[in-house]
Amino acid sequence: MNEAKTESLTYTLTNNEITNDYKMLGINIDTKLTWEPHINRICNKLSGVLYLLMNLKKVLPDNYLKVAYFGYFHSVIGYGIALWGNSAHTNSVFVLQKRAIRIITGSNIKEHCRPLFIRERILTLTCLYIYDQLLYMWDNQQKYQQRHEIHSHDTRNSNTFSLPKTRLTKSMLNFEYMAIKIANKIPEKMFKLPKPVFKTKITDWLLDKAYYKIDEFFNEERNY
């Protein structure tokens, strides 16, 4: 069967309206899992937050402005990011995050933001995604097999988690696949640490990195 030429037809005996996306637990899920409707909704909300930050900038010192940022902006982009954080549409969210940090720091529109993220100790969107995925893997590490549990002979990086076999790009981008792939880029010993220590070390490391793209993380020779 040629999947590229296959069309689907939905049959129903009810009068319920068929929609291309629906909202569940605050997350907009579309039928093609592009996450575009959810990201568009986030951007609309964040645009309002930027307006709020600009007004607060006039009356609040920077430390209180950062509190407002974490309460109204950071909390929005962090919600459910493990699901949508690797979407092709996330750049529109990151553009707004860079505008937010320029407002907080009083920087001009042409100011490079990476040093600002590092100085202000604010996780970039990509770093927030990586953090969330690593935290998921720490919580669920017993659920996934490590390579030494599958192969009887020694293999390179035998203590890393085994990736599921998949050929479809959409499958390779799903959140579990990406979580394992991200986890395999940091030393296995990190997952032996107590959770509070793990969270602190991962956070400090990501704050110093300020990745803009997930490819920056994967292309580094040694991430941690």
Task: Identify the meaning behind each predicted range.
Residues 72-87, 128-141, 181-183:
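Extended, well-ordered alpha-helical segments in internal regulatory regions
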